[in-house]
Regions:
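A helix-centric hydrophobic-segment signal that preferentially recognizes long
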Residues: 1-186
């Protein structure tokens, strides 16, 4: 009889331990999804601003139709993405298109003098700053989840429960354009 009790206690401890691992992984996954919800709010605001921005520049940038089309297509793709990883990839593309747009705007001094355009640019800049802040929070939550998935003994059960390492929301190739200091010419 004592052997049976020992076996039952060991089995109970193992079951409780596995449940604790599962619950920890679920909590971390939910934290990541909640962090992305904050990003989603800012992305929606950016998506809503893009048509206004394009409308404001159409008259000035007649020769840049390809750029404006690329921005519109990237926006539509981003709005149509459903999973977090699809949205991340689509938003990288939109960020790249907007970055290229900002570079081309430099060639249009009349456009830069437009108060409507400048207001939209300021709004876009504010949204980008908010996005940077919530992206840091999202990446922190993603990092915590990835570490938990990689740690032993969690790694033994994570894939069995459907948990895997998740993608961070970095700027990818557009990072250099966002981080490059503006060139000042006199």
């Amino acid at each position: 009889m004592p052997t049976l009790w020992i076996v039952l206690i060991v089995v109970a401890v193992v079951v409780i331990w596995v449940i604790a691992i599962y619950n920890t992984l679920v909590k971390l996954k939910n934290n990541r999804e909640n962090a992305f919800a904050d990003i989603d709010v800012q992305l929606k605001q950016r998506h809503d601003l893009v048509p206004q921005l394009i409308g404001a520049v159409k008259g000035y940038m007649e020769h840049e139709a390809g750029t404006l089309t690329a921005i519109t297509e990237a926006r539509n793709k981003a709005m149509g993405a459903s999973s977090i990883n699809e949205k991340i990839a689509a938003e990288k593309e939109l960020s790249g298109a907007l970055s290229g747009f900002n570079i081309q705007v430099e060639a249009y001094p009349d456009l830069k003098a437009s108060s409507n355009f400048m207001q939209l640019q300021t709004e876009l800049s504010d949204i980008e700053n908010k996005l940077a802040a919530v992206r840091r929070f999202f990446n922190s939550a993603t990092k915590e989840l990835n570490i938990a998935v990689q740690k032993f003994p969690n790694v033994l059960f994570a894939s069995m429960f459907g948990f895997k390492e998740e993608e961070m929301f970095d700027l990818g190739d557009t990072r250099a354009a966002h981080e490059k200091a503006p060139e000042v010419k006199f």
